[in-house]
Design a protein with these regions (language model features):
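Soluble or luminal CAZymes and related metallo-dependent hydrolases
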Residues: 1, 62, 102-105
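Metal-dependent nuclease catalytic regions and adjoining charged, substrate-binding loops involved
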Residues: 17, 30, 74-152
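Short, structured patches in soluble enzyme cores that scaffold and shape functional sites
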Residues: 21-25, 50-51, 82
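Conserved catalytic cores of phosphodiester-cleaving nucleases, focusing on short active-site segments
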Residues: 38-56, 70
Length: 152
């Protein structure tokens, strides 16, 4: 994996500028700025590196939205580089404007949910969790079970 990755980044025909940089952007009517940290900045591209268990055939929507924030913040073409044991699969993120609109819509949906009440637990009860999803750890599952009154 290390050799594949090393060879891949050595072959990029673009001037390297910076690593682990910060972007801060304003999106639409959202009252707080979006802050993100990209992995690699080149003269013409901003790249985010993702390690994955298997080779990817395309960019996930969440990663495309993340890279689009970096693109707006840097003014560069966004790329996601998926690194697996078999090599590097680089993908250019297309439709940055559409992805930024999705970020804004998600933020507005969250803002609407939070506007229902000053009580965060009431806001949480506006949705119902899928505790079978891998993202839930044991500690957060216990808290969720308490909030949503879910049995074992």
């Amino acid at each position: 994996m290390v050799i594949h990755t090393h060879d891949f980044y050595r072959s990029i025909n673009d001037e390297f500028k910076e690593e682990q940089g910060k972007v801060k952007i304003k999106i639409g009517d959202i009252p707080v700025p979006w802050i993100g940290y990209f992995d690699l900045l080149y003269a013409d591209k901003v790249r985010d590196v993702k390690t994955v268990a298997r080779k990817m055939s395309g960019v996930s929507s969440a990663h495309a939205r993340q890279a689009s924030i970096y693109a707006v913040g840097t003014g560069r073409e966004p790329w996601i580089d998926y690194i697996s044991t078999t090599g590097v699969a680089p993908f250019e993120v297309k439709n940055v404007k559409q992805r930024i609109a999705e970020v804004e819509n998600a933020a507005l949906a969250l803002q609407r949910t939070l506007s229902f009440s000053d009580d965060i637990f009431e806001c949480c009860r506006c949705v119902f969790p899928d505790l079978d999803h891998w993202i839930w750890g044991e500690t957060t599952k216990l808290a969720a079970k308490d909030i949503w009154q879910i049995g074992d």
